[in-house]
Amino acid sequence: FALAFGNISGGYEVRNPYYKGCIKNKDISLIPQSRGEAQSRVCLFEGFMDFLSYLTLKQTDDSAICINAPCDYLVMNSVSNLKRTLTYLQKYTYIHCYLDNDLAGQKTVETIAGMYGRCVYNESNCYAGYKDLNDYLRGKKQ
């Protein structure tokens, strides 16, 4: 058994205690707040476990982490999907980046900020001291 999370190319990110990989095509996952028009805000995650952690924190009203406004959600499923991600970000006024507190995550935020400027918010500062949002939720410090 495993948890599978679909992407926009019909592939699936798959996780279980023994396996972390992709079935079919590797791509980003876009989860709109509602059908039709995009929101003005998007929350960007490196992996779907961080996205699920965000949803858990949102249910507990963690205002230190979560955005109190309607948002679309974009899961990169790997920082290697940055180029694909950049094309989807252009339609948003506010880009909230919940990426890992490591070199790859920070370089990715810098690249996005270099392209979209002041509309980019590095939310990883809210969970400094933790590798990622999932570790923050679990209380597992670096």
Model-assigned labels for residue ranges:
Residues 1-88:
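Phosphate-handling DNA/RNA-contact segment within nucleic-acid enzymes
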